[in-house]
Amino acid sequence: MLSAVAKPRQLASQILNFGLILSTAFMIWKGLSVVSDSSSPIVVVLSGSMEPAFQRGDLLFLWNRNLLQETDVGEIVVYNVRGKDIPIVHRIVRKFGTGPHAKLLTKGDNNAGDDTDLYAQGQDYLERKDIVGSVVGYVPFVGYVTILLTEHPWLKKVMLGLMGVLVVLQRE
């Protein structure tokens, strides 16, 4: 009789713990977004265009609070192209003008040409508002899990299945 009461309580406890983990992760993400002033304070390098500086799968930490200084040539930035939601990590190679309306031209370290072909149609340069953040640190290869899960959707299902089995089999 006692075990029949304990099982729903154990299930409720596991559900609440799972909700706590999700809400904590969300709060940490939003906190980092506010502190760094970036919609994406952490990004994963998706291609080899920035080698040797960054490898595919590196986890980058961004900072977008350049209140007292401008974005400079040589700075590695992450930007989004209008109409696409894939962040691009490249270095600023040219700058025209100063202030918030300065025109910026970017290029991947491992690319032959600049990024004008990557920009939105009719856009020849980036402006400061297009920049998601400047790279201030990184952890090598940690983001490779994200790449694997994106490139192999079946892997997501396997991982979710394994986590489900672990939750069911877990005993306190």
Curated annotation (Swiss-Prot):
Coiled coil: none
Side of membrane Lumenal, spans: 36-172
Its membrane topology: Single-pass type II membrane protein
Catalytic activity: Cleavage of hydrophobic, N-terminal signal or leader sequences from secreted and periplasmic proteins
EC category: hydrolase
Broad class of where this protein is predominantly found: endoplasmic reticulum
NCBIfam families named among the record's database cross-references: sigpep_I_arch
Name used for this protein in its record: Signal peptidase complex catalytic subunit SEC11
Gene that specifies this protein: SEC11
